[in-house]
């Protein structure tokens, strides 16, 4: 496979906002053709416009919890661009701030469906495309979280799914070796996004106190993902932890 990003095709899930939008724009600026996946068509179009528009950007509204829609996403990517070289497997939701004893089954399932099942379905779609195409191979980057290592209070569904993503990453990395498919994970702490905005106003700490936390410019995340993606397939960033330097992560769990 060519190492030139101008010949590569990326699929980005959760591309309508936050980390997904920032990474989709950065990949497009680096020369990738980018397929933008997310639930809201209007948000995907906003991302496409912010990335410069044009024929090398494809908005593909997708609910990652629905197998048929994920199949359609990768079919659209292949029909438009002929291959898939990169999946940034980013779509995710949280249900933080709910006491463990107050969690409902529906809330638990909604987080698991997006953060774990959706990530599996998208990784499988990319894996199948990468295995079958010529030249063979590609790269999958799963968006984990520092919650894959240490929980926050009242975050059981999110924390459990992010721990599970680490296992998924390891399994894909192992199973992909024979097909030149690399899989890595980026664990991000406190990037400035709409989802994480509450961090600046104060969130519950392990000791029960409420405190604001240091934040990280989402552009740093986008740069890290582009770096991981740009490596030749003989090299892989298996796990990267990228966090705000002064956030309370080390020592919290």
Place the predicted regions along the sequence by residue.
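Substrate-binding pocket helix/loop in short-chain dehydrogenase/reductase
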Residues: 98-100, 107-109
């Amino acid at each position: 496979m060519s190492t030139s990003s101008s010949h590569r095709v990326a699929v980005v899930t959760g591309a309508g906002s936050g980390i997904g939008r920032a990474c989709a724009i950065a990949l497009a600026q680096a020369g990738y053709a980018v397929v933008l996946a997310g639930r809201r068509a209007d948000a995907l179009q906003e991302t496409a416009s912010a990335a410069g528009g044009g024929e090398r950007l494809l908005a593909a509204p997708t609910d990652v919890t629905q197998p048929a829609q994920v199949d359609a996403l990768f079919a659209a990517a292949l029909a438009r661009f002929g291959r898939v070289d990169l999946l940034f497997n980013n779509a995710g939701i949280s249900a933080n701030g709910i006491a463990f004893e107050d969690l409902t089954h529906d809330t638990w399932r909604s987080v698991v469906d997006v953060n774990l099942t959706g990530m599996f379905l998208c990784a499988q779609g990319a894996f199948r495309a990468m295995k079958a195409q010529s030249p063979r191979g590609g790269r999958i980057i799963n968006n984990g979280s520092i919650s894959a290592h240490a929980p926050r209070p009242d975050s059981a569904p999110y924390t459990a799914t992010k721990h599970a993503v680490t296992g998924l990453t390891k399994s894909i990395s192992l199973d992909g070796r024979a097909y030149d498919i690399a899989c890595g994970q980026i664990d991000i702490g406190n990037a400035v996004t709409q989802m994480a905005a509450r961090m600046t106003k104060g969130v519950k700490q392990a000791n029960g106190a409420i405190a604001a936390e240091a934040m990280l410019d989402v552009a740093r995340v986008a740069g890290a993902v582009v770096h991981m993606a740009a490596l030749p397939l003989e090299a892989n960033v298996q796990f990267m932890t990228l966090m705000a330097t002064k956030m309370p992560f080390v020592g919290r769990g």
